[in-house]
Structure formats: structure tokens, C-alpha cells
């Protein structure tokens, strides 16, 4: 009996470990809330996708309802038994409904410009699968499962950045994402770009036969904009945290004052992000010898003194934008909306990108400000004041030191200012004026992506400067947290004694922020 109990215990342990391992490596698509953090985890860790039983049932139920409605009625349903856009009054015969969907995908694949980065295309696939799984779109189960096959097998549809107006959904990029389902378009697989038909043959997959409405379900949606937004939010949270840490190092290197971060000051103007940033700065600088030494100056420049007010506003903006995008990625955003429970098929406007276009513009403005204030601190560090040598080099004149790092930061910051001009202010009517207001949210997404990368570059340049400046304060030391950050940075980027080629070191600083 004892041996039997022991064997059962071991078997149960092995089964538990196996289940836990499977669950850890597989994310089940369901109606449960999908967080932005979970999306990041799925992409970063290569977690596989599978449909939950409930999701399968919802997809099948919606498809069955739609088929029954088409069979039972001759009443035109937009995009299901009619043409698209301003052709909505042109009725299509039932024997041409599948071809209608393929024609839609082919004709709408008009993307130009650079490719959407692979990481963002993978987010796009995940978000499209999630949206279709709610059972309001009318997709067939095999269509959704093939999208999951693409995701799990590392098949990346080739999608181009430009072409979407961000209303009627992201028609152009989602057309490129969807073409490989039917053996058209291109994919990247194992680092090689190939025709989708070749990939299907390689995998032994048959092209999907689209049913009525499926092309619309795939193309009408905000998943291109949303995927850029999710990626940008994940980076924005990382950069916001780094901005505080780097500002703390810059402040100590500049012989700045700690008093502006006193809690009492911020309690009388209690914006959440401001309070958080002030507390974070105090925490980062706790134990610093430099911060405790007597100060000659009464005040610091705004770029140091107002870190809580500026960085804090960025935090609050990130928080707001995150709440909007969180709702968006847990929504069905195509048209028409099929509601089996309510016995309704309604042509409406859930594809319109305005709810996320404005927040993406807002986030681009916020991150641009994070870069703006960072560049101002860089300027202070290289200006030869408060006991620091001009351009942070021991022998200025013979050496130019960090002079041009500030030029680079200023150039990038200036570019950000133009990129942060809101795209959502613009609207150009299309489709014979049937689509007479559009969000331009896809343009907001593209610009936000660039602003994120530019802001990262400026913060990396500030860290490069701050680490150099801090060493001119030795043997006095900053706080344990700042000194550990400095120590880790020095493993990647050395102190600069005499002039060297700087751009590889800036790139190393950028990579350091990504670790």
C-alpha cells in the first residue's frame, strides 16, 4: 500500500508539472480579459496560442446563425451580399459570395512603404484572433485556426506600413495580413520572404475557402493600429521608468538639489504621476553623498527641478492611453456586427479608429516631452558649469568630448516635434464620399512608433553623458541605486578620456536600455 501511495504521489506530481508546463507555454484565446502585459509576455516568450472550447463554440454559433440568415432571406446585408463602401447598394448573388471576399482582399492589398516590423505583425495576428474569437464577426472556425497556425509556426505575413486611413478599419494592412490564408501575398518564414502559396505547400496546408463576410471580418478592424499602440505602450512604460533613473543620475552629476522632490510639495498638487515621480526620485537618490553636500546654488534649472511635473504627466498619459487600448484589444471591431443572441446583423461603425487615434497622438506628444526635457539636461551637463568640464572631457580644446552628442539629441528631439503633430486632426474623405470622415489613426501609429524609438535614443544619450559627468564627482558617490546603474553601464560603455568615435557607444547605450 505504501508503494502504491508513493507511486500515485509521483504520478500526480508528474501530471501536475506537465499541466503547468503546458499552460505556461500555451495561451488559450477566450472571452477572459487580455491584458497588454499578457500580449507582451506572449510575444516575448514565444507562447503558443490555442482556442478555448468556449471560443470555438462562439465562433461556430455565429457562423451558423449568419449562414441561416443568408439562406432564409433575400434582404441585402452590407458586405455579405452586397459590394463594399459606396458600392453597398450593388447586390451580389449567393453563388458569388466567396469570390466577393477574395476580390475584397486582393483589391484592398495596396500597401506601400516600409514593412511593418515582424514583432508588431505578430501582435496584429494575436489581436485579430482575439477579436474574431468573440463570435460577433461570422468567421469560420478553420479561418481562425489557420491564423493561429501562422502565429504558432512563426509565419509572418508581409504587411506594409502605409495605406490605412484608420476608418473602415485598417483595410490595407489587414488585407496584406490576410492574403496568405488563401495562398496569396507574401510571408516571411525562418528569415526568408516567399510567396504564400509556397509556404502553404511547404506546410502541407490547403488554402482557406472563405465564406460570406469573412473577408470583411478579416479586413475591417483596428488591429494594425492597435498592434502599434500595444507595442508602443510596452516601450513607453519601460522608457518612463528609465527616464526617472537617468534623470536621477544626471541630477547628482549636476550637483542638483533633492528638495524639489519633497512629498509635502506634491501633496498640495496631487496629480498621481507627479506624486509617483517625486517619490521615485527620492528613492533613487537615497544614500547619495553628492545630494547631501552643501549647495552654492539656490535653485536648479526646470529640467531638473520639474522632473515630477513633466515625467509625472507622461506617466498619467501612459496610464490613460493604456486604459483605452486595453478596451480596444478586448473588443470586436469589424462591420457589420453579427449578434446571434439578439437576432441582429447591424451595419454600424465599430471599425472607426478615432477612439485610439487621439490617444496615440497624445502618447506621441507625451514621449516627445520626455525626450525634450532629457535633451535639456544633456545640454546642462556638457555646458561646463557647476564644476563639470566643458563637454565632459578632461582636456577640452584638443578634445571635443561630448559636444556633438547634444547636437544629435537636439536633432532627434526636433524630429520628434514634427512627428508629434496630431494625425487625428486630419480627415480626407474617400470611397465616393461614403467614408466622409476618417481617423488617420494608422498614420498616428506609424509616427508614434518613430517617436518611441527617437525618445529611446535621446534617453540613451543622456545616460551616456550622465555616466561620464558622474565620474568627475568621484571620489564622492551617488546613491547605491545610481552607482549600481553606473557600474552596469560601464560594463558596456567606457569612460571617455580622449576623443573616440562615438556612434558605436551611443548604440551600446541604446541596447543597454533594452536589457
Which ranges hold each PLM region?
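FAD-binding core of FAD-dependent oxidoreductases
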Residues: 78-92, 96-100, 107-132, 160-182, ...
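Cysteine-centered functional microenvironments
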Residues: 159-164, 341-345
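Glycine-rich, flexible loop motifs
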Residues: 26-74, 104-157, 251, 266
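Conserved, non-catalytic sequence blocks in retroelement Pol enzymes and Pol-derived host proteins
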Residues: 136, 165-167, 397
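C-terminal auxiliary extensions adjacent to catalytic cores
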Residues: 26-47, 51-58, 62-65, 70, ...
Amino acid at each position: 500500500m505504501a508503494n502504491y501511495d508513493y507511486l500515485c504521489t509521483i504520478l500526480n506530481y508528474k501530471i501536475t508539472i506537465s499541466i503547468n508546463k503546458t499552460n505556461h507555454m500555451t495561451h488559450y484565446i477566450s472571452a477572459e480579459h487580455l491584458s497588454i502585459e499578457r500580449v507582451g509576455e506572449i510575444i516575448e516568450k514565444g507562447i503558443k496560442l490555442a482556442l478555448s472550447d468556449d471560443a470555438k463554440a462562439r465562433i461556430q454559433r455565429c457562423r451558423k446563425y449568419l449562414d441561416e440568415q443568408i439562406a432564409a432571406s433575400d434582404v441585402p446585408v452590407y458586405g455579405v451580399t452586397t459590394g463594399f463602401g459606396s458600392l453597398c447598394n450593388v447586390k451580389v448573388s449567393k453563388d458569388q459570395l466567396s469570390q466577393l471576399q477574395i476580390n475584397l482582399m486582393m483589391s484592398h492589398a495596396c500597401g506601400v512603404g516600409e514593412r511593418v516590423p515582424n514583432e508588431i505583425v505578430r501582435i496584429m495576428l494575436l489581436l485579430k484572433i482575439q477579436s474574431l474569437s468573440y463570435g460577433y464577426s461570422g468567421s469560420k472556425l478553420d479561418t481562425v485556426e489557420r491564423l493561429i497556425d501562422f502565429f504558432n509556426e512563426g509565419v509572418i505575413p508581409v504587411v506594409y506600413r502605409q495605406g490605412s486611413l484608420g476608418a473602415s478599419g485598417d483595410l490595407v494592412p489587414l488585407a496584406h495580413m490576410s492574403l496568405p490564408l488563401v495562398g496569396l501575398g507574401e510571408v516571411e518564414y525562418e528569415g526568408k520572404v516567399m510567396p504564400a502559396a509556397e509556404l502553404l505547400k511547404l506546410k502541407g496546408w490547403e488554402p482557406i475557402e472563405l465564406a460570406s463576410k469573412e473577408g470583411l471580418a478579416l479586413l475591417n478592424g483596428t488591429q494594425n493600429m492597435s498592434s502599434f499602440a500595444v507595442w508602443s505602450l510596452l516601450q513607453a512604460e519601460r522608457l518612463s521608468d528609465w527616464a526617472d533613473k537617468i534623470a536621477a543620475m544626471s541630477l547628482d552629476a549636476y550637483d542638483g538639489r533633492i528638495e524639489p522632490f519633497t512629498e509635502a510639495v506634491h501633496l498640495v498638487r496631487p496629480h498621481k504621476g507627479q506624486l509617483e515621480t517625486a517619490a521615485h526620485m527620492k528613492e533613487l537618490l537615497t544614500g547619495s553623498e553628492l545630494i547631501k553636500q552643501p549647495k552654492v546654488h539656490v535653485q536648479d534649472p526646470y529640467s531638473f527641478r520639474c522632473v515630477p511635473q513633466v515625467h509625472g504627466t507622461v506617466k498619467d498619459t501612459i496610464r490613460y492611453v493604456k486604459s483605452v487600448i486595453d478596451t480596444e484589444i478586448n473588443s470586436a471591431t469589424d462591420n457589420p456586427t453579427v449578434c446571434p443572441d439578439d437576432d441582429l446583423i447591424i451595419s454600424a461603425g465599430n471599425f472607426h479608429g478615432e477612439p485610439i487615434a487621439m490617444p496615440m497622438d497624445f502618447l506621441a506628444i507625451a514621449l516627445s516631452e520626455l525626450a525634450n526635457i532629457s535633451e535639456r539636461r544633456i545640454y546642462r551637463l556638457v555646458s561646463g558649469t557647476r564644476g563639470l568640464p566643458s563637454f565632459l572631457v578632461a582636456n577640452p580644446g584638443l578634445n571635443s568630448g561630448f559636444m556633438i552628442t547634444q547636437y544629435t539629441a537636439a536633432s532627434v528631439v526636433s524630429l520628434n516635434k514634427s512627428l508629434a503633430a496630431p494625425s487625428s486632426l486630419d480627415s480626407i474623405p474617400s470611397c465616393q464620399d461614403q467614408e466622409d470622415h476618417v481617423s488617420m489613426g494608422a498614420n498616428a501609429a506609424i509616427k508614434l512608433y518613430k517617436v518611441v524609438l527617437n525618445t529611446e535614443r535621446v534617453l540613451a544619450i543622456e545616460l551616456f553623458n550622465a555616466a561620464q559627468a558622474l565620474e568627475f564627482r568621484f571620489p564622492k558617490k551617488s546613491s547605491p541605486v545610481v552607482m549600481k546603474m553606473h557600474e552596469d553601464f560601464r560594463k558596456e560603455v567606457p569612460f571617455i578620456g580622449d576623443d573616440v568615435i562615438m556612434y558605436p557607444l551611443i548604440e551600446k547605450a541604446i541596447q543597454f536600455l533594452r536589457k
